Amino acid sequence: WEQRKLGESLSFLKDGTHGTHADADGGPLLLSAKNIKDGTIKWDETDRRISQEEFEKIHANFSLKTGDILLTIVGSIGEIAILKESEGLTFQRSVAFLRPKEDILSEFLCTEIQTPIFQKELESRKSTSAQPGIYLGDLAEIPVKYTISLDEQNKIGEYFLKLDHLITLHQRKCLT
């Protein structure tokens, strides 16, 4: 196993749009941290939409890709999801986009981000203003541990994703 800073493990680290955008019916979704919960992106027809022109301005210099990790960094800090479909949606600044380098699988990195050690690092680095947040530079400095074997990363990542789904199912069952 190796340890390095999160920023050294990523080929891409950015947060969502900082601008204000007018609502537009039928346009691409503009989601925020509230839409990332329990490892998934949750949205419905009441969520904001922006014009295609605004969307293209936001993504003039980058694009989201399937497999990117979404991490909430403002408000509710530390929720994650892996982007399954990148078309027709973008995010406000409350969400960071993490794209692991080729030697780290997204599923494995998500498992690492969910560990109590990583979550404690997030907690200790957050700014305490009106709404708590973590700066990308501080996020990039958090140490992560990983195995260099992609096969081992895959097995670990799959195991914990299945376990997370099972826990979510049991939680839902308890609520009914």
PLM feature spans:
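Glutamine-centric residue-chemistry signal
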Residues: 3, 92, 119, 131, ...
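Short, solvent-exposed loop/turn positions at domain surfaces
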Residues: 17-18, 58, 128
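DNA target-recognition patches
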Residues: 7-10, 20-54
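A short beta-sheet element
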Residues: 32-33, 46-114, 118
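Structural detector for helix-capping/boundary residues
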Residues: 4-7, 34, 116, 137
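A short glycine-rich beta-alpha junction/loop motif
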Residues: 73, 88-96, 127-152
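Amphipathic alpha-helical segments with low aromatic content
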Residues: 1-2, 142, 149-176
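Non-catalytic DNA-recognition/assembly elements of restriction-modification systems
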Residues: 1-15
